[in-house]
């Protein structure tokens, strides 16, 4: 399908950028090369200390659709919120500045919305290892796009189980009417988990398309590889808030939320224990003990995590030894 500025609604593409001088060009090349051209591309430079600021300004001079905002470093959530505040598009899209997208990425998401008439469309992603990704993303023009309308419950179940629709903000196209719930918590990690369930709920239905044409870069030092306890603790708080938001009698996925909360609690305990943080370890040991009965009864919690909860109540010293042994063995593989 061919899109023109006259027949297609404006889409705001929000790109937060912090110290991404080695990735930003590839990201923006993939965005300005979209087949869907009626875009406002909002670059939010979040206090970068490398060449990111200069690159943002250079790209603004290259393409009139690009606008740049420079702000002091406040984190990913604040940068996204800044982009949301100044956006004028009928739809919003988030792309991380170290990732890339296929040339038809936005076209596919728009098509899913047009066919289904819903407020939110989504696709999955393809992982790219740093230093091994192609110069240009693989084109998807030769395949037939499969579009499926998912209920709120189906989308939540998918996200909670690592399915095709996740809690991440990128890889999606949001109707601007969802802005009221599309506010990221500032100063927190796992910010997408903290709000996306509310966005799903507000949207009611989600149009999923299977192009998988968001290219997610796995790089050393990224949050996905970090074991810092405060990051994992934010995940625990996010799933706790999600659990409190819903009633166990009114949704089919409640025990799956609980399983994710219990897993995040165990991960946080392990992180504090390995760091030698006695206060943090004690705090989460008490939470493990308090949740042992809940963990034992939860059918969605992995057996290994059930064992963590059981040992926390009966033999925390043995638990710590086993966790350290597991980490040491894992680091050798």
Where do the PLM segments sit?
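N-proximal low-complexity "stem/linker" segments adjacent to membrane-targeting elements
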Residues: 1-32
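Short alpha-helix within the catalytic core of nucleotide-sugar-dependent glycosyltransferases
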Residues: 25-29, 53-57, 89, 102-115
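A conserved acidic beta->alpha catalytic loop
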Residues: 30, 37, 45-54, 72
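Glycine-rich, basic loop-to-helix element that forms the pyrophosphate-binding segment
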Residues: 71-87, 97
């Amino acid at each position: 399908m061919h899109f023109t500025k006259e027949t297609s609604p404006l889409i705001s593409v929000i790109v937060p950028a912090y110290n991404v001088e080695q990735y930003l060009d590839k990201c923006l090349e993939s965005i300005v090369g979209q087949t869907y051209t009626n875009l406002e591309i909002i670059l939010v430079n979040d206090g970068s200390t490398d060449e990111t600021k200069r690159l943002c300004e250079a790209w603004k001079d290259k393409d009139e659709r690009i606008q740049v905002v420079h702000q002091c470093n406040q984190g990913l959530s604040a940068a996204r919120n800044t982009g949301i505040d100044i956006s004028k598009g009928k739809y919003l899209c988030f792309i991380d500045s170290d990732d890339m997208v296929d040339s038809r990425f936005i076209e596919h998401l728009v098509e899913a919305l047009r066919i289904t008439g819903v407020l939110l469309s989504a696709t999955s992603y393809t992982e790219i290892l740093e230093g091994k990704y192609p110069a240009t993303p693989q084109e998807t023009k030769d395949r037939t796009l499969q579009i499926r309308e998912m209920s709120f419950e189906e989308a939540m179940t998918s996200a909670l189980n690592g399915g095709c629709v996740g809690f991440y903000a990128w890889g999606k196209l949001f109707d601007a009417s969802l802005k009221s719930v599309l506010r990221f918590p500032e100063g927190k990690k796992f910010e997408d988990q903290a709000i996306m369930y509310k966005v799903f709920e507000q949207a009611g239905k989600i149009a999923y398309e299977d192009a998988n044409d968001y290219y997610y870069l796995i790089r050393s030092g990224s949050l996905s590889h970090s074991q810092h306890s405060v990051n994992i603790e934010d995940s625990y708080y996010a799933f706790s808030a999600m659990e409190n938001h819903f009633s166990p009698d009114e949704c089919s996925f409640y025990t799956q939320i609980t399983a994710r909360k219990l897993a995040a609690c165990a991960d946080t305990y392990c992180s504090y224990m390995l760091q030698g943080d006695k206060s943090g370890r004690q705090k989460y040991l008490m939470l493990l003990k308090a949740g042992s009965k809940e963990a034992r009864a939860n059918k969605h919690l992995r057996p290994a995590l059930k064992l963590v909860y059981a040992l926390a109540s009966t033999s925390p010293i043995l638990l710590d030894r086993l966790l350290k042994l597991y980490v040491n063995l894992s680091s050798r593989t």
